[in-house]
Amino acid sequence: MDIRLHHLSIGYRRGPVVARDINITILGGRLTCLIGDNGIGKSTLLRTLSGFQPKVGGEIWLGSREADSLSQRERSRIISIVLTQRPEMGGLTVHDLVGMGRSPYTGFWGNLAARDELAVRQSLVETGAWPLRDRKIDSLSDGERQKVMIARALAQETPIILLDEPTAFLDFHSRIDTLRLLSRLAHTMDKTILLSTHDLQLAAELADLLLLLSPDGLRPVDPATISQDIRQRIQD
């Protein structure tokens, strides 16, 4: 499912506009990485796309639907999001946490039906987290925990997955594994995956597209043409 942005402005209604007049199409079946200076508004854009924060102006189209026409439940069946903040859910097992991804279909406290259990199992298998299914969340490494959070998003069965700095807190090998996993899911499961990152080198190697966010908008960039100044600011 494509994401189409028409003259989108993001920011705060009673505060500054972070970026304005964004016009771009983010294609399905691809891993797209969002880059830009610290504090430029990458998280704001992701929150706006997910519906957690209202837009300032313009339009967001998710496939053939304008986002404003969607109910919260409809949107939760189109977009799943993995945030930077690590949830304090140490008492839950991996299976229980991934099962929470089914809440758009069961309700937050709903019991998992056979179809839901199948979605949980498939998500754990696809992400390589199946061996962790009976572990407590607080026993996991940062890399394992991120894999489980991606599995929860996958269990939500949405065509679009947004991730805010998914490689933060991870060691180098886990960062590689995480981006490779997301690339594979985008290509093999036809997911539209958009993530923010400061890890420009890995993003340039593994992403299908880099998008540079600035106050002037959002534009695709060729990693080979990014100036050293931009590279330094993004990676600091």
Label every PLM stretch briefly.
Residues 1-2, 9-21, 89:
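A short, flexible loop at the N-terminus of ABC-type nucleotide-binding domains that lies
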Residues 50:
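Helix-to-loop junction immediately C-terminal to a conserved catalytic motif
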